[in-house]
């Protein structure tokens, strides 16, 4: 609601550190809620950034610990990384 209000007032809105799991970066990925956010951002032409390009033991980390520093193959990318990759490629 606050973002809708800001947009109506002509203020710039950028969604940073968004994700589809609990605010602490863990828990199950809630695809229903994530897709609602994606739809809202697309509808309002709001840019976004997802987190985290890391290999930590948390849901929001996009890489497995075995991933190389660059040139990631699908096997190096965790579930959340694939979700974000798909959303970005769909733009």
Q: Which role fits each region the language model picked out?
A:
Residues 8-91:
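Substrate-binding cleft of secreted/luminal carbohydrate-active enzymes
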Residues 1-4:
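Substrate-binding surface in catalytic domains of secreted glycosidases
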């Amino acid at each position: 609601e606050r973002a809708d209000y800001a947009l109506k007032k002509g203020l710039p809105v950028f969604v940073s550190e968004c994700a589809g799991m609990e605010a602490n970066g863990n828990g199950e990925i809630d695809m229903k809620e994530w897709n609602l956010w994606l739809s809202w951002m697309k509808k309002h032409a709001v840019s976004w950034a997802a987190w985290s390009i890391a290999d930590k033991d948390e849901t929001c980390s996009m890489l497995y610990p075995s991933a190389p520093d660059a040139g990631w193959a699908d096997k190096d990318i965790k579930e959340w990384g694939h979700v974000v990759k798909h959303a970005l490629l769909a733009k």
